[in-house]
Amino acid sequence: MNNAIFPNKFKAALAAQQVQIGCWSALASPITTEVLGLAGFDWLVLDGEHAPNDVTTLIPQLMALKGSASAPVVRVPTNEPVIIKRMLDIGFYNFLIPFVETQEEAARAVASTRYPPEGIRGVSVSHRANMFGTVPDYFAQSNKNITIIVQIESQLGVDNVDAIAATEGVDGIFVGPSDLAAALSHLGNASHPDVQQTIQHIFARAKAHGKPCGILAPVEADARRYLEWGATFVAVGSDLGAFRASTQKLADTFKK
């Protein structure tokens, strides 16, 4: 089949601690998402938390990535089983779960993506993810091929990082630098030494549990530093940021 869904190559790459360079997709456009997919990134976050995305906007973007080597990762707006189920049914296999603070919340995210008895995912026999009922052994294969990445972006999450990283079914730990900075009383200043030290601590604890860690780092120097610290999957920019910067540069070239 074209763009075969199993095995999940992104999940395997994370398990093997292979560096994965990604990009954020926030414009909710299948055209810009397709352009990102052609650029050669290993993975793309289709953001459902801070971008204007929902089921109706995400399906065309998944279609736009069909045949691309870039793995689509959906950031859901919240750690809620029904929302996660809907993302599963439209064809996502890689999940970024925001604001996870405890082992119980991490386990809830994992359970939301697994069919019983391993989890609590609701059963539909025909949907986009199983190619409308044509994927053999979809139920068992799906349970084994879902990627769960949890975001740590609060002090409580930092305090519980060991328990979260040790949660069965969690494939990776992702740092939300902006929210983490705010939680540490450095709103708008993720480069503050306290924030950077905490990021390094999270990376170290994830590594101690054999879990890859990731982060969003649109500044090249930051991205390279995080890679040196052991980050495995790093989003190095966004479609919105690239578009804004390039159009501003173009306008400035002729208007100033």
Curated annotation (Swiss-Prot):
Q: Which InterPro entries match?
A: Aldolase/citrate-lyase_domain, GarL, HpcH-HpaI_aldolase, Pyrv/PenolPyrv_kinase-like_dom, Pyrv_kinase-like_dom_sf
Please give an example of a GO cellular component term from this record.
cytoplasm
Q: Which SUPFAM superfamilies does UniProt cross-reference here?
A: Phosphoenolpyruvate/pyruvate domain
* Xref: PANTHER family: 2-KETO-3-DEOXY-L-RHAMNONATE ALDOLASE, 5-KETO-4-DEOXY-D-GLUCARATE ALDOLASE
According to its UniProt record, in which pathway does this protein act? Carbohydrate acid metabolism; galactarate degradation; D-glycerate from galactarate: step 2/3
Q: What family, per the record? A: Belongs to the HpcH/HpaI aldolase family. KDGluc aldolase subfamily.
Q: Which gene encodes it?
A: garL
- Name the chemical reaction catalysed here: 5-dehydro-4-deoxy-D-glucarate = 2-hydroxy-3-oxopropanoate + pyruvate; 2-dehydro-3-deoxy-D-glucarate = 2-hydroxy-3-oxopropanoate + pyruvate
Q: Where, by residue number, is the active site?
A: H50
Instruction: Give this protein's Gene Ontology molecular function annotations.
Output: 2-dehydro-3-deoxyglucarate aldolase activity; magnesium ion binding
Q: Tell me, which GO biological process terms does this entry list?
A: D-glucarate catabolic process; galactarate catabolic process
Site feature location: Increases basicity of active site His:
D89
Protein name in UniProt: 5-keto-4-deoxy-D-glucarate aldolase
Q: Which NCBIfam families is this protein grouped with?
A: GarL, PRK10558.1
Chain's role: Catalyzes the reversible retro-aldol cleavage of both 5-keto-4-deoxy-D-glucarate and 2-keto-3-deoxy-D-glucarate to pyruvate and tartronic semialdehyde.
Write down the Pfam families for this protein, in alphabetical order: HpcH_HpaI
Q: How does it assemble?
A: Homohexamer; trimer of dimers.
What keywords are assigned to this protein? Lyase, Magnesium, Metal-binding
- The EC number(s) attached to this protein equal 4.1.2.20
The record's comment on cofactor binding reads: Binds 1 Mg(2+) ion per subunit.
UniProt cofactor(s):
Mg(2+)
Q: Where does Mg(2+) bind?
A: E153, D179
Q: Where is this site: Transition state stabilizer?
A: R75
Which annotated residues bind substrate?
Q151, S178, D179
